[in-house]
A protein has these predicted regions:
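Terminal-proximal interaction/regulatory segments of ATP-powered molecular machines
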Residues: 295-367
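Short amphipathic alpha-helical segments that mediate assembly, nucleic-acid/protein binding
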Residues: 249, 253, 261, 265, ...
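Surface-exposed polar/charged interaction patches
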Residues: 203, 207, 240, 258, ...
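Structural motif
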Residues: 6-10, 215-222, 289-300, 311-316
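AAA+ P-loop NTPase catalytic core and its hallmark functional loops
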Residues: 1-203
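Accessory nucleic acid-recognition modules appended to NTPase machines
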Residues: 253-311
């Protein structure tokens, strides 16, 4: 199959959705790489833009194909009488189609999750959904404004996925998702993944921090999804014990390891020691105009986090903001400033800082 990152797949959308009957698409990839999130966000947004709508104007219906039998998926045959009184069989309307109708939306996405893990009989009845010329299920037409997309794991991922039937694959375009650490780091920064994890991924993402596929041995491994889950535990722990707290022992290490395995956890622990090269929140608050800005991108991310977490009042938030604006990596500076302003808004901290106003005007579109 064609290998492509999410960014590369997204580049196809202006052309893919430039027709009234876009070809169905299947995304194959490892566990936890973000296929579902990509379909719900980037794909939904692109389809909406092609229609002159917003993402919220579109319906979104998810159906997990695995665990369904063919009748449950396509509808159940029931005996009925025709006008002449003769008995005949008629299929009930498929539950999936009822879900689509219940949204009340003219346009939307039907997302068929875990498609490769579905029984072959289910793949067979779903075949017409994957053919834009048929666009139906169990003999019932699907609404013309609804796009069909499926996703699932590869057969090599040890998740119960099988090869898709050939008569299904020649009607769709299939991409095998190639995980991109830089793309994930951008997403993670916008979705409150802890900066220590993002910095570690930036530094070690290309040398085995993330698993390309499940290991041969039966153990936890690091995926984009599992490290995102681990981030919640790390964030809660460091918020309570301080951003410089040791993570090489006790409860926090166990919690992280239970998500990403021992090897990736040790990589994160080793990287966390580098926090000693980054200014502390106290140092930033003491002199935000002169406090050191690290050269390394990963260190800058940690320094920005120190600045954000040092903000406990409106005045300290202004000082943290001043330091953040001095950071030389634009994405880190912008996203950290945005994060800090969310904290300021939640705490109802007012500011008279000219820098904040200038920043908001300059980056209004990004914000």
């Amino acid at each position: 199959h064609t290998l492509a990152t999410f960014s590369q797949i997204e580049e196809t959308f202006p052309y893919h959705f430039a027709t009234s009957t876009p070809q169905p698409m299947i995304l194959l990839g490892g566990t936890g790489v973000g296929k579902t999130s990509f379909v719900y966000t980037q794909m939904r947004k692109a389809l909406a833009e092609s229609l002159g709508l917003t993402a919220d104007d579109l319906g979104f219906v998810v159906e997990k194909m695995a665990g369904r039998d063919a009748q449950e998926f396509a509808g159940t045959p029931l005996p009925v009488k025709d006008k002449a009184g003769r008995h005949q069989m008629e299929y009930t309307k498929p539950p999936l189609l009822l879900k689509v109708e219940q949204t009340g939306k003219e346009f939307g996405i039907i997302f068929l999750d875990e498609a490769p893990a579905a029984d072959q009989s289910v793949q067979k009845v779903a075949r017409d959904m994957f053919d834009r010329n048929e666009h139906s299920l169990g003999g019932w037409p699907l609404p013309q404004g609804w796009f069909v997309c499926a996703a699932g794991n590869r057969s090599s991922d040890k998740s119960g996925a099988n090869r898709l039937l050939a008569h299904l694959t020649d009607t769709v375009c299939i991409y095998e998702v190639q995980q991109s650490v830089p793309d994930w780091c951008i997403w993670a920064d916008k979705n409150d993944v802890h900066p220590l994890i993002i910095a570690c991924a930036t530094q070690h993402g290309e040398d085995g921090f993330f698993a390309e596929m499940p290991p041969a041995s039966y153990e936890q491994y690091n995926s984009f999804r599992s490290i995102t889950n681990a981030s919640v535990h790390l964030t809660n722990y460091l918020n309570k014990h301080g951003q410089d707290a040791d993570i090489n022992k006790g409860v926090v290490k166990r919690m992280i390891e239970s998500n990403i395995g021992s090897v990736a956890t040790q990589t994160l622990v080793n990287f966390s020691v580098l926090r000693e090269h980054v200014p502390t929140g106290l140092q930033i608050q003491a002199d935000p105009e002169m406090c050191e800005i690290p050269d390394n991108t990963g260190y800058q991310m940690l320094a920005a986090n120190s600045a954000v977490t040092s903000a406990v009042t409106a005045d300290s938030a202004d000082r943290a903001f001043l330091y953040i604006l001095r950071i030389t990596t634009a994405d880190i500076s912008i996203n950290s400033a945005r994060r800090l302003q969310k904290i300021m808004a939640l705490n109802d901290w007012s500011t008279n800082s000219v820098l904040v106003s200038q920043f908001n005007q300059k980056y209004a579109e990004a914000l």
